[in-house]
């Protein structure tokens, strides 16, 4: 039958899948879209919303780019699904230098198109409908989103602002049920900048032992530390537990666009053959991670660790952290715990001074008036409308101006 002879019917409406009902990622959400529209109209937007080092003048070490260029002729085909062997061996060597880190086999390392892809793969392989994952509040929201997408239920445990944003152990214990399957630890923490103490990490491991939970360790910022802070890998305090450690090149090596991440699996595996087969299946189904970026891993991990020049006294990242923290605390009604790591500050707006009922509206109004883009605290699954996240990547002078403008904005802002 020709199309002209078919009865006229309105086109079928294609709705969004119900699987996306609870999937939210505000870091690039509606306010970010509004910022893009303003940019298209010619406005200059200061983007304090995303931890993307390159636009702020942070360049990858030359040796990384040279190695990728040299490897391009050999990177035209697929690699092994887990990634090229030389990169995975370099990751094994990296963790051999981490005090107490459990033995890591090269076959237990998976490369990914950034940590984000490996989070997605892990949650899809791990979760059945209704399975619960303990996730910090505030969190990096992709963990919550991918838990929901996989059919799981994110259960947020509180981190205590009055204790340098360390996890609230009692709150975690109170939220464990017979459906709890995994405990996520983000350390150093995004968005708070907290670096967890050995005592807290041991208590988290004890909870996992007691309740037979899988440990998930997001440690992408483990080399971005300030003020003599020491990072302790979660796997190192729990060598007897199955632990999935996530890391990559995006932050410490300033190559977020290369999308080069990894997953390292340590601990006993006999009881987890089904999970590991699932991760294998999903890693194979995407064929392989992008191959050129895999060639950056060996040289990055084995070469000069230039991130140290940025975080020590006189380093740009340390200076910017200091400026952000100091200037935020100068604003009436604003307080900020000093970040010990990562690339963010998570200030609090005193509700007795700033009556914010809708932090999304606050962020949108700030964008429209001051052309500054931040992310509201509820975008990180913080329960109250009294926080926001600021990226500390801009030059110190730009940060100082932006925070001053933010303070001026707050002084007359009402909801």
Question: How does the language model describe each region?
Answer:
Residues 2-3, 174, 355-357, 361, ...:
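PLP-dependent enzyme catalytic core of the Aspartate aminotransferase-like
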Residues 135, 156, 215-217, 374-376:
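Hydrophobic residues in well-ordered beta-strands that form the structural core
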Residues 298, 314-325, 336-350, 384:
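Conserved glycine-rich beta-strand-loop-beta hairpin in the small C-terminal domain of fold type I
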Residues 5-114, 121, 288, 300-303, ...:
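N-terminal small-domain helix-loop-helix segment of the aminotransferase-like
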Residues 41, 150, 210-211, 241, ...:
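Helix C-cap/helix->beta junction micro-motif
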Residues 31, 48, 68, 91, ...:
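Generic structural signal for small/hydrophobic residues in well-ordered secondary structure
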Residues 75-206, 223-236, 404-405:
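Conserved core of the PLP fold type I
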Residues 236-315, 325-327, 410:
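Conserved core segment of the aminotransferase class I/II
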